[in-house]
């Protein structure tokens, strides 16, 4: 078992997919642009998505984690999930009733001048896949936001 220090620099799709593979994140369905999400959601999965379409160069990485009925969305700026991801994660009935069923953060854990959103997403889905509570992961990231230090994953 070792540690992996995630970069504070921008990551491309290939970088994210390589880190996810190296970290052995279970049920990872890949890194996608918002218009190229998988065709169907699985019962247990996680992934990372860029908020721009495939015709654009990319702007910001966000992620989701799904384990049965539990669905979690993470944006390092605390923004709500984009409509495309809500459609992907919710059932037809939940969409029709505008049901709030995706747990999400509303806190900012990334500085405006930072490009580490991809690394933050990898950190979140890695620890969610290990069974850590979302709130505990957010607390670690909030403390790091207040006192910046390298983003390190332990016990890989």
Regions found by a protein language model. Give the residues of each.
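General structural signal for secondary-structure boundaries
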Residues: 2, 8-15, 83, 132-134, ...
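Generic detector of well-ordered alpha-helical segments enriched in charged/polar residues
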Residues: 13-21, 86-89, 138-139, 150-154
């Amino acid at each position: 078992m070792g540690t992996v220090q995630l970069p504070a620099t921008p990551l491309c799709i290939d970088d994210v997919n390589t880190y996810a593979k190296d970290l052995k994140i279970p049920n990872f369905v890949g890194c996608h642009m918002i218009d190229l999400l998988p065709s169907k959601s699985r019962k247990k999965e996680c992934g990372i998505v860029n908020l721009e379409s495939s015709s654009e160069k990319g702007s910001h990485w966000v992620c989701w984690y799904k384990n049965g009925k539990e669905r979690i969305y993470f944006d390092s700026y605390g923004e709500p999930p984009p409509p495309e991801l809500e459609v992907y994660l919710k059932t037809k009935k939940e969409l029709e009733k505008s049901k709030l069923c995706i747990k999400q953060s509303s806190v900012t854990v990334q500085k405006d001048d930072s490009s580490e959103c991809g690394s933050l997403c990898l950190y979140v889905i890695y620890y969610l896949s290990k069974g850590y509570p979302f709130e505990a992961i957010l607390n670690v990231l909030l403390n790091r936001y207040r006192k910046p230090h390298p983003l390190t994953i332990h016990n890989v």
